[in-house]
Design a protein with these regions (language model features):
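An accessory alpha-helical subdomain
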Residues: 187-190, 194-198, 203-261
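Alpha-helix boundary/capping residues
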Residues: 33, 137-140, 220, 235, ...
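Peripheral terminal appendages
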Residues: 2-5, 236-293
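Catalytic cores of RNA-modifying enzymes
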Residues: 1-215, 278-279, 288, 292
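Alpha-helical recognition domains of nuclear gene-regulatory proteins
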Residues: 102, 132, 231, 243, ...
Length: 293
């Protein structure tokens, strides 16, 4: 909409492409577009419904990233180059976790918006999801697969925290749109910057095998109190203890004890191991991606 965020960006002098899914906001946005000399471009669509897994033509408000970036005039850059475009938005609360997973799969596969390089996301997310994204081992309720994968993939920076009381969050039926969180604090909306790491695809991690890394981490956190050695043995035919020893990780370590960088090192070691039976992941990885989409 033509609110504070849009006007703040325009007042800063940057070129803005507003992707708006609410038809009620389009007239005022288009009026603002017409009053500016090319600084604002308005597109009807939903940024968080980019590249749905459908056959045939994509129907608005869903969008195709190729068409969006062509309209914006943004060309793809090599991964290690500078950020090609900065995205500002608010994650839909009802689908917040699902949206974070979709973006994560796209990041690791260099698909959708990440085909164009290290696209920077500046997004408002709930405080409880921010706590998950930045959690470390020892934070039992917050530390999850999502924590590991976002921290490996991106630099995460908290830019601002705003109390929910600053926003109108009631649904049409009068209920609160923001449910109370039992396990984690959720009193604020957090503006978070997610910048893909330049060195993400160095070493053994590549877009072609990254979906296996994602699924490996998800499998480890399916039972966070299980011994990592037991998990590894099921993938490397009894070679788990040796791999852990090489990485200086105690054989008694639970899957929730490892830091994000430990998971990356472990995956790269598994890739080098001729005992790794990661091929059995393939069908389950594809099914997981379909479910997320």
């Amino acid at each position: 909409g033509p609110g504070i965020l849009t006007r703040t960006l325009l007042n800063a002098g940057v070129r803005v492409v507003a992707v708006e899914s609410n038809l009620a906001f389009l007239p005022s946005l288009q009026s603002l577009e017409n009053s500016l000399d090319g600084q604002l471009k308005v597109i009807y669509g939903d940024f968080f419904r980019l590249d749905p897994l459908v056959t045939g033509k994509v129907k608005p408000p869903a969008l195709c990233s190729d068409e969006l970036f062509e309209t914006m005039g943004v060309a793809a850059l090599p991964w290690r180059e500078d950020v090609p475009v900065k995205v500002f938005g608010i994650l839909p609360q009802r689908k917040e976790r699902n949206t974070l997973w979709r973006l994560l799969f796209a990041l690791y596969e260099c698909s959708s918006i990440y085909k164009y390089g290290r696209v920077e996301l500046n997004v408002f997310i709930s405080e409880k999801e921010y706590k998950v994204l930045t959690a470390k081992p020892g934070e039992v309720r917050a530390y999850q697969a999502l924590s590991v994968l976002w921290q490996v993939g991106c630099e995460i920076q908290l830019l601002h925290m705003e109390p929910w009381s600053s926003f109108i969050t009631n649904l049409k039926n009068g209920a609160l749109a923001i449910p109370k969180s039992v396990c984690l604090p959720n009193d604020h909306l957090c503006l978070v910057r997610l910048t893909p790491r330049q060195n993400l695809f160095t070493g053994g991690l590549k877009p072609t095998n990254s979906s296996t890394f994602v699924f490996m981490v998800k499998q480890c956190f399916a039972k966070p109190t299980s011994r990592l050695a037991d998990r590894l043995n099921s993938w490397s035919l009894g070679n788990g203890g040796k791999l852990l020893s090489e990485q200086e990780i105690p054989e008694s370590a639970e899957t929730r004890n490892l830091y994000p960088e430990d998971y990356r090192r472990l995956f790269e070691a598994l890739q080098k191991s001729n005992m790794f039976t990661g091929t059995w992941f393939h069908d389950e990885v594809l099914e997981s991606i379909r479910n997320i989409n």
